[in-house]
Amino acid sequence: LTRADHTHHMPTNVQFKGSAQRLQKRRISEETCQHYKVYRDGELLRFPYYSSDKTLQGFKTKTKLKDFKYEGNTTDTLFGQSLIPSTGKRIMVYEGELDALSGWEAYPNWAHVSLPHGAASAKKDIQKQLQLFQGYEEIVLFFDKDEAGKMATEAVAALLPSGKVKIAHLPDPYKDASDALQNNDAEAIRKAIWNASPYQPDGIVDGKSLLELVTNPSPPCDFEYPFAGLQQMTHGIRYGELTVISAGTGLSLI
């Protein structure tokens, strides 16, 4: 991961509160929290969001009861986007902030970002950042394994540059990266990234999967045509085949 500019500007109406602390239950270290500037402020966890020019705009706050609120202004950027360069080898995209932190904890020094509004707004949020993804060679979508996560994966993958998208798959029973790390299985996160499968849209077939079909000779014909030219072109007819003969196109000669 190329070193990024971590200089952040702050308007006067929002400010950091609290301090970086280890998230014991989540198995996320103080160092990871400090890297993302995710601070504990009493009962709140505060996730900073920045504008595209790295000006601090506001915070998403989370309570122990998993209630979320926003302070300051909302932005179009992804969580963690201010920490990453505009180009790179690989970028991981998660549904939630704690998943992104879990990804960094398991696989540090790579680009880990998350959606600002979860799976429901995934397509809209990614659409606003298409220019960012153009700069990366590989885009790993690491969304939750529930139905909402699967739908978001399909919607987002279809938006992103063809040939760059891979889908991360966690083994059961883990539902997301945070769940795996809470169970002390950082290796599952790493393997999900390393073994992410290339995205293949419905109806599109990988040419490599057809190699055997096109390189094997056709089976012998069951019957030969009585027409020499047609026989030479088709090598006869086989059961299950249909040969359609149509007229040429153009102006009628009649």
Q: Which ranges hold each PLM region?
A:
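TOPRIM metal-binding catalytic domain and adjacent DNA-binding surface shared by DnaG-type primases
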Residues: L1-Q57, T74-K89, Q131-Q134, W194-S209
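Phosphate-handling DNA/RNA-contact segment within nucleic-acid enzymes
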Residues: E43-G135
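Acidic beta-strand-to-loop metal/phosphate-binding motif
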Residues: I91-V93, F133-A148, H169
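Acidic, metal-coordinating catalytic cores used for nucleic-acid/nucleotide bond scission
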Residues: A119-K123, F143-E154
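Long, basic/Gly/Ser/Thr-rich N-terminal segments
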Residues: Q129, L141-D144, A152, P171, ...
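Short, aromatic/basic amphipathic alpha-helical patches
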Residues: Q129, M151-S162
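Interdomain "pre-motor" coupling segment immediately N-terminal to P-loop NTPase/helicase cores
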Residues: A168-V205
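The Walker A/P-loop phosphate-binding site
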Residues: D202-I254
